[in-house]
Design a protein with these regions (language model features):
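Small-residue (G/A/S/T)-rich helix-start motifs and N-terminal tracts that mark the onset
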Residues: 1-119, 128-142, 147, 151-273
Length: 273
């Protein structure tokens, strides 16, 4: 079989304008499955990323022992205490799973992905629960690994990944039927047929929590109707743009994930220009 030519995408996708008669149900119910003892901040940042990304409703599902801490992180999202059954989770249009969830949650992650047929963003600890060949879905999953996580998925050293980021990302996305967002300088987004290399962002974003914000942001864009490739591409661009705006105000050295959240509104406005 002939491999189709790779399309290089240069334009940043846009969200459609909101209708005047719309309501919160039109902009997606996002369920964030994240957090554990010592990592409640990951759940908060992911939930807040979904809110800033425009989701109509956000619920953060986390272990009961951190639920009160997570609930205090933002009054605009709801919380839900996780059980050991993915089938008990509240209904959602989009699921983001992984940030701070813990490596012990593999069975739960696999159960969740088996129960939920809609769009998913898989990040962080949830990636460790999966192996190549297990990603096939009716709606392509969005995977957001950093180079170390991607190296495990492809069974290659990190040095090999960094030496051929685009080539390995495209091949993996094509084989597995996913949208892959490979983080790092020049984030690569590909569905195996199209590819874009993100041009926004700066070294100040190399700090804990920034990836959690990105996961929530992409989930929100999916909830508003963007297809997986477009949601990942716009998410990467807006996330990096927020980082660039934040660096102007606080500098690269002092930049935190909360600064990204503060500047996401301006970044999304800029994406429409």
């Amino acid at each position: 079989m002939t491999t189709p030519p790779l399309e290089r995408v240069l334009d940043v996708p846009r969200l459609p304008p909101r209708r005047g008669d719309s309501h919160k149900g039109d902009y997606g119910r996002v369920l964030v499955v994240a957090g554990s003892r010592g990592f409640s901040g990951a759940a908060v940042l992911c939930g807040r990323g979904a809110l800033r990304g425009g989701a109509g409703l956000v619920t953060v599902a986390c272990p009961r022992d951190v639920q009160d801490v997570v609930a205090a992180g933002d009054p605009c999202f709801m919380t839900y205490a996780l059980t050991d059954r993915a089938g008990d989770l509240p209904k959602a249009d989009v699921v983001a799973v992984g940030p701070g969830l813990g490596l012990h949650a593999g069975d739960f992650v696999r159960d969740l992905l088996a129960h939920f047929a809609g769009p998913v963003v898989i990040d962080a600890d949830a990636l460790a629960a999966l192996v190549p060949g297990s990603f096939a879905r009716s709606v392509p999953a969005v995977l957001t690994p950093h180079p170390g996580e991607f190296a495990r998925l492809v069974g290659r050293p990190v040095t090999d990944v960094q030496a051929d980021r685009e080539g390995l990302a495209v091949a993996f996305a094509r084989t597995e039927g996913v949208v892959l967002l490979l983080k790092g300088s020049g984030t690569v987004v590909t569905d195996g047929v199209r590819v874009t290399t993100n041009t926004t962002g700066n070294p100040g974003m190399a700090t804990g929590g920034c990836g959690d914000v990105l996961t929530g942001l992409i989930a929100a864009l999916l909830g508003q109707g963007l297809p997986p490739f477009e949601a990942a591409a716009l998410g990467a661009w807006a996330h990096g743009r927020a980082g660039d705006l934040a660096a102007v105000r606080v500098g690269e050295v002092s930049l935190t994930a909360v600064d990204l959240l503060d500047h996401l509104p301006a970044a999304l406005i800029a994406s429409h220009r």
